[in-house]
């Protein structure tokens, strides 16, 4: 093959990067030693990789175009860039392109040492009245916060962070084993892709420290049991200036002595006298906001009936709509009656029996069974 890199790849000197890559992949697959029996395949494969290694780099390509092939090669040799070392670097690149082409993967890009902080979860218990009105709660927890000495950079004041020269900022190195490559964390930068020559003494180069925090969180009115509220950026600080995680506050509402919650509706047991149940009337009932309202009891109300107070339940979160309060009637029978009350009830009993005897209903049907 000709030593002209453009001719090796079969492209013109004005070829775009996309055209270069397309030509490179086609030839690399054709001449890869593991995919062909051609005796000259390995030599051709090395030439293809050397050509692409230069032309894919805009600075190297510009130098190659300016000085020509021979001068460029001599300069590379004096700079210590042997062809054997370049070949191993390039073969790792080709495997990345193979996987990208066939499996949807991609060549690993330089990593950033600015890793995002972890999300945090906080369990907060409130009562039903607090859930109704909404409340501002102060919470305390420990987490990683930005180092106040290096301001999150991880390096001593005035020091700069440099790209790792062992992995080129990728954070990993590759070892070839046959057709496959094994990727492992770079031993020099520990997978960070960057080198801190003089780490901050307080945070040991991490850019963050452990600290107890106090935070005021707003709980909106109408929050339900099990609601998760997200506080963006209030989680753990990121590594070396990375974005902070989020804080998730999980709400638990303690059971109430009077009300049972069903979404935005409230249910409660309402005891009334049998007189009120029979005659009807109005009674005062307490509602969740801490006052009393009138409830009309229809005459003839039965035990277990449900009476609804519209818009007297819980508010719906971030809405002006409220649920209802549903009362479950429980008729109370007096245990201790005065003589006068007993006499009146006896009269009521006689009249009730007389009415049932005359209406030919259930009472007469039962009576006929014994006659």
From Swiss-Prot:
One of its GO terms (molecular function) is zinc ion binding. CDD domains: DnaJ, DnaJ_C. CXXCXGXG motif repeats lie at residues 147-154, 164-171, 186-193, 200-207. Belongs to the DnaJ family. It is found in: Cytoplasm. Zn(2+) 1 binds at residues 147, 150, 200, 203. The J domain is necessary and sufficient to stimulate DnaK ATPase activity. Zinc center 1 plays an important role in the autonomous, DnaK-independent chaperone activity of DnaJ. Zinc center 2 is essential for interaction with DnaK and for DnaJ activity. It comes from Rickettsia akari (strain Hartford). Residues 4-68 form the J domain. Its cofactor is Zn(2+). The lineage of its organism: Bacteria, Pseudomonadati, Pseudomonadota, Alphaproteobacteria, Rickettsiales. SUPFAM superfamilies: Chaperone J-domain, DnaJ/Hsp40 cysteine-rich domain, HSP40/DnaJ peptide-binding domain. Homodimer. Pfam families: DnaJ (PF00226), DnaJ_C (PF01556), DnaJ_CXXCXGXG (PF00684). One of its GO terms (cellular component) is cytoplasm. Transmembrane segments: none annotated. One of its GO terms (biological process) is chaperone cofactor-dependent protein refolding. InterPro entries: DnaJ, DnaJ_C, DnaJ_domain, DnaJ_domain_CS, HSP40/DnaJ_pept-bd, HSP_DnaJ_Cys-rich_dom, HSP_DnaJ_Cys-rich_dom_sf, J_dom_sf. A zinc finger (CR-type) spans 134-212. This is Chaperone protein DnaJ. Keywords: Chaperone, Cytoplasm, DNA replication, Metal-binding, Repeat, Stress response, Zinc, Zinc-finger. Zn(2+) 2 binds at residues 164, 167, 186, 189. Signal peptide: none annotated.
């Amino acid at each position: 093959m000709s030593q002209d890199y453009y001719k090796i790849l079969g492209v013109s000197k004005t070829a775009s990067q996309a055209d270069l890559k397309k030509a490179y992949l086609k030839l690399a697959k054709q001449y890869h030693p593991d995919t062909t029996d051609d005796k000259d395949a390995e030599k051709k494969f090395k030439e293809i990789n050397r050509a692409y290694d230069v032309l894919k780099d805009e600075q190297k390509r510009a130098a190659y175009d300016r000085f020509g092939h021979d001068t460029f090669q001599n300069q590379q040799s004096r700079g210590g860039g042997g062809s054997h070392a370049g070949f191993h670097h390039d073969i790792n690149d080709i495997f990345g392109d193979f996987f990208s082409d066939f499996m949807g993967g991609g060549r690993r890009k330089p990593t950033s040492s600015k890793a995002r902080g972890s999300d945090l979860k906080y369990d907060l218990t409130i009562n039903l009245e607090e859930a109704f009105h909404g409340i501002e709660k102060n919470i305390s927890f420990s987490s990683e916060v930005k180092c106040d000495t290096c301001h999150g950079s991880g390096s001593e004041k005035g020091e700069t962070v440099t790209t790792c020269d062992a992995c080129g900022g990728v954070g990993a190195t590759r070892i070839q084993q046959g057709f496959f490559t094994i990727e492992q964390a770079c031993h020099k930068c520990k997978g960070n892709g960057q080198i801190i020559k003089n780490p901050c003494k307080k945070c040991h180069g991490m850019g963050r420290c452990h600290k107890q925090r106090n935070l005021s969180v707003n709980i909106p009115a109408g929050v339900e049991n099990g609601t998760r509220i997200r506080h963006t950026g209030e989680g753990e600080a990121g590594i070396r200036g990375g974005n902070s995680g989020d804080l998730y506050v999980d709400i638990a509402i303690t059971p109430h002595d009077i009300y049972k919650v069903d979404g935005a509706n409230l249910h409660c047991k309402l005891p009334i006298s049998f007189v009120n149940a029979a005659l009807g009337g109005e009674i005062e009932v307490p509602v969740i906001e801490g006052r009393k309202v009138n409830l009309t009891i229809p005459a003839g109300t039965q035990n277990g009936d449900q009476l609804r107070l519209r818009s007297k339940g819980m508010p719906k979160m971030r809405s002006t709509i409220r649920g209802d309060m549903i009362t479950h009637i429980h008729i109370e029978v007096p245990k201790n009656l005065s003589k006068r009350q007993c006499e009146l009830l006896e009269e009521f009993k006689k009249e009730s029996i007389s009415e049932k005897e005359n209406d030919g209903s259930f009472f007469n049907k039962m009576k006929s069974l014994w006659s």
